[in-house]
A protein has these predicted regions:
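Metallocofactor- and cofactor-centric catalytic cores in central/energy metabolism, strongly enriched
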Residues: 2-145, 149-163, 167-173
Length: 173
């Protein structure tokens, strides 16, 4: 396992200088490369096989497709993919972690960004700059706390009762 090190950034501005970009799957046709991956090895072959299975699921009118998400995939640049999968009726239901909805989607909906970083960066250097890390992605802790404050304000305005996740997300907008 690699040792963590200071990669020479040293200032918050230097750490947070490359926003993660969310891919637009409607801007290119990847079908040929994905299907050709079935003839490769390791994760490439599994990616090609998964795409083939997913295409069969889309053709089957009796198939219910669940998209399950972890928060880190949204931060990694997949939000537009999920949006387009819903828009083009490629999924029937989404099961997501709270982090996916709150700390990733809502966070970016407020105009904040996730930034490209390094999994090898010394976390103590990040901590000095008030930066959080999800593997190789950085988040400005000040912005994350602003997001949390807004969520608290939303919750504080609600009548006291038990809310389902769906009800609370609705209140978030």
């Amino acid at each position: 396992m690699s040792e963590k090190k200071n990669l020479g950034h040293n200032t918050k501005k230097n750490f947070l200088n490359k926003p993660v970009e969310h891919i637009d799957i409607t801007s290119f046709d990847s079908r040929d490369i994905i299907s050709s991956m079935q003839k490769m090895s390791f994760v490439s072959r599994e990616t090609g096989n998964a795409a083939s299975i997913f295409n069969e699921m889309l053709k089957d009118k009796n198939c219910t497709i669940f998209l399950t998400l972890a928060g880190s995939t949204s931060a990694a640049g997949c939000m537009n993919i999920y949006k387009d999968m819903v828009k083009y009726n490629m999924v029937d239901a989404i099961v997501a972690t709270g982090a996916s909805i709150v700390d990733m989607d809502f966070f970016e909906g407020l105009g904040f960004k996730h930034y490209q970083g390094s999994q090898f960066q010394d976390d103590s250097e990040l901590r000095k700059n008030y930066i959080d890390r999800i593997y190789d992605t950085y988040i400005d802790e000040d912005e994350l706390q602003m997001c949390d404050k807004i969520i608290c304000e939303i919750a504080d305005k609600l009548p006291p009762k038990t809310y389902t996740s769906r009800e609370f997300i609705y209140e978030m907008g």
